[in-house]
């Protein structure tokens, strides 16, 4: 089992990223909470991973902290919640998700991508005791790379690419194309310089 990856961030297009380790590229699926903390392309990234095997696929999921990986593992134990839906749910910070569950906030949960009322109700029941065991104390996540957290502005900003990438990411998380386009359009402004910034702003308006 692969528990952690340390390598060069070669590609990133939410929710997928590619980590190059000694010339071998590892395709990793990561939640947006991890994407927000990624370093720039070409820099070293460290990810805590979970290897998922099913009858039809083998997938590697990556997280910026052990806490997030633990939440992912808790989520996929819930009936009806697979890895893809768990990644969508983790568009919300683990501490915020735990608070929603403990507060019984059904309204907030149904706004998460792919989560309907029945799934939200199941999450409230099945996750209540589990999140109590999760360390949700606000703290700095372990950096995903040496340059993580540094704001970089690309001198050439292609607005169309940023918008297209953001919409694609939201659709990949489980939102309908019309929902994604509407959220991205509402969130975009001239201060946004990366697709990650736009995705974060769009999700903030939806969740």
From Swiss-Prot:
Positions of region (Domain III): 158-207
Primary location class: cytoplasm
Keyword DNA-binding annotated: yes
The keyword Protease belongs to this UniProt entry's keyword annotation: no
Pfam families recorded: HHH_5, RuvA_C, RuvA_N
Chain residue ranges for the region called Flexible linker: 143-157
GO BP: DNA recombination; DNA repair
Compartment(s): Cytoplasm
Gene Ontology cellular component annotations, sorted alphabetically: cytoplasm; Holliday junction helicase complex; Holliday junction resolvase complex
Superkingdom, natural source: Bacteria
GO molecular function, one term: four-way junction helicase activity
Annotated stretches, region: Domain I: 1-64
Keywords: Cytoplasm, DNA damage, DNA recombination, DNA repair, DNA-binding
Ranges for region Domain II: 65-142
UniProt function note: The RuvA-RuvB-RuvC complex processes Holliday junction (HJ) DNA during genetic recombination and DNA repair, while the RuvA-RuvB complex plays an important role in the rescue of blocked DNA replication forks via replication fork reversal (RFR). RuvA specifically binds to HJ cruciform DNA, conferring on it an open structure. The RuvB hexamer acts as an ATP-dependent pump, pulling dsDNA into and through the RuvAB complex. HJ branch migration allows RuvC to scan DNA until it finds its consensus sequence, where it cleaves and resolves the cruciform DNA.
Subunit text: Homotetramer. Forms an RuvA(8)-RuvB(12)-Holliday junction (HJ) complex. HJ DNA is sandwiched between 2 RuvA tetramers; dsDNA enters through RuvA and exits via RuvB. An RuvB hexamer assembles on each DNA strand where it exits the tetramer. Each RuvB hexamer is contacted by two RuvA subunits (via domain III) on 2 adjacent RuvB subunits; this complex drives branch migration. In the full resolvosome a probable DNA-RuvA(4)-RuvB(12)-RuvC(2) complex forms which resolves the HJ.
Family, as annotated: Belongs to the RuvA family.
Family matches, as NCBIfam families: ruvA (TIGR00084)
Notes on the domains: Has three domains with a flexible linker between the domains II and III and assumes an 'L' shape. Domain III is highly mobile and contacts RuvB.
Entry protein name: Holliday junction branch migration complex subunit RuvA
